[in-house]
């Protein structure tokens, strides 16, 4: 078995283990039963997100994955309820740290694109959404993407119908140190956002809504080569939805938010593996 080449799934798990060691402690408290570590839970939840499967199916597949279990140092397989409870306990702050850590080895260049998309939250049960009076059945998800590596730098999720210009300042403030150029479509045309970007030494490349000939002139002077790189954000949105699903399975809004961050973490790990394969000959994989 040792002579077999590493599969993409095994390399993903090994990479996720490294990130989990950087992001979380070994155990939640010193009073933990120490049967499974927090890091094992984090990696298994990322694996669940990558395979877009259920807790029960993931546990069933782990039985037939000896090399994956060895990479995780699993002596026994956790029950589905154990993973479900771990997902409840791991707060959003943990997943945001993991998202930041997943960028550590990626050659980001600071040219970013911001755009919003929607994920369905009524996937599991239409009856449930009607019974709970869930009038807004989509989650508005704003991604800040590095256009050089297609990595997700940050994510903002809301259950409301906030305008893009209300969301973007929060994302910019949180990631000011990582942004040199901010590209966005006309939905982000706001003077306050441009002023905020310049205050943080960020070059805003945002198209103006064309109400006057002056606005048309400003748009004509935009650096089109640089501005058009914002399309990478749409590419990332489409890739995440295609590979990991355009929906969330959880019913609680705070778990739905975490689920979307996990999708972004998994996407970043995949991008890191793809870039490393471009630098090294991975044709045998």
Predicted regions and their residues:
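Structural motif
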Residues: 30-39, 133-134, 251-260
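C-terminal domain-tail junction helix/linker
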Residues: 249, 253, 259-285
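Major-groove recognition helix of helix-turn-helix-like DNA-binding domains
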Residues: 70-90
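DNA-recognition alpha helix
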Residues: 56-72
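Helix-centered, glycine/charged polyanion-binding patches within enzymatic domains
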Residues: 181, 186-252
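Basic, short loop/linker segments at the boundary and entry of helix-turn-helix/winged-helix-like folds
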Residues: 2-50
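Charged alpha-helix within mobile-element recombinases
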Residues: 229-240, 257-269
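Polybasic low-complexity intrinsically disordered regions
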Residues: 33, 39, 50-53, 83-200, ...
């Amino acid at each position: 078995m040792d002579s077999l080449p590493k599969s993409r799934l095994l390399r993903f798990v090994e990479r996720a283990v490294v990130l989990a060691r950087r992001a979380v402690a070994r155990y939640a408290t010193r009073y933990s039963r120490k049967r499974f570590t927090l890091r094992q839970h984090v990696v298994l939840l990322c694996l669940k997100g990558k395979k877009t499967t259920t807790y029960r199916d993931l546990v069933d597949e782990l039985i037939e994955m000896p090399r994956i279990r060895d990479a995780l140092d699993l002596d026994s397989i956790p029950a589905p309820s154990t993973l479900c409870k771990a997902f409840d306990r791991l707060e959003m702050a943990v997943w945001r740290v993991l998202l930041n850590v997943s960028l550590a080895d990626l050659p980001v260049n600071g040219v970013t694109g911001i755009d919003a998309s929607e994920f369905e939250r009524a996937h599991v049960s239409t009856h449930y959404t009607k019974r709970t009076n869930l009038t807004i059945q989509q989650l508005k998800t704003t991604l800040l993407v590095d256009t050089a590596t297609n990595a997700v730098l940050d994510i903002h999720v809301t259950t409301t119908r906030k305008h893009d210009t209300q969301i973007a300042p929060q994302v910019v403030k949180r990631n000011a140190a990582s942004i040199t150029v901010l590209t966005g479509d006309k939905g982000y045309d706001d003077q306050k956002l441009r002023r905020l970007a310049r205050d943080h030494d960020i070059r805003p490349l945002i198209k103006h809504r064309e109400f006057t000939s002056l606005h048309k002139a400003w748009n004509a002077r935009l650096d089109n080569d640089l501005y058009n790189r914002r399309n990478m954000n749409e590419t990332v949105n489409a890739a995440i939805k295609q590979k990991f699903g355009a929906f969330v399975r959880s019913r609680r809004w705070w778990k739905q938010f975490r689920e979307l961050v996990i999708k972004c973490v998994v996407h970043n790990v995949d991008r890191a593996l793809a870039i490393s394969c471009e630098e090294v000959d991975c044709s045998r994989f």
